[in-house]
Amino acid sequence: MDLKQAIAESIENSGVAILPPMDVKESMALLIENGVKAKTCILDPWYNKGIGGQLSDTEYDNFIRTLLDQSSLMSDIIYLWGFPEIIGPYVRFAPEQFKMTAWLTWYYKNCPSVIRGWRSSQNACIQFTKEGASLHPENFLNAQQELRFEEGKMRFIPGPTSVIEAP
């Protein structure tokens, strides 16, 4: 059984395929080479505080651009997560044939702080979509909306909110 078949079988049986630990660029190249397509690609890279210290801004920009470009070869929707001050500049890094669709904010109350001063109580996400990609808003409906959707009684399908509160 080749890798593409193994991934398809795993997704069919359990809804997910888990690759062994490896560098993200290697895993993406492996998936691309094997023709594996995903409905969405979710990226949550390290925040330039990796092994051996920090990369220069240019090196980190190139790292993020490579992740986004590789993701665009295997998915029509890409999410880039991180702290707002880290990912903010990457709004302009949409891969070719993609556009920024949304800036999502996930905030959490009662965030414990071990430092003095300001503490981050939110994460941000940039959503990039390929031209013509379906956003699947039906996946974000509440129970009442799901029922009306299934009965064909919705005048329009509301999109998800751009601010998500953590419980």
Predicted regions, residues:
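Core catalytic lobe of class I
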Residues: 1, 6-167
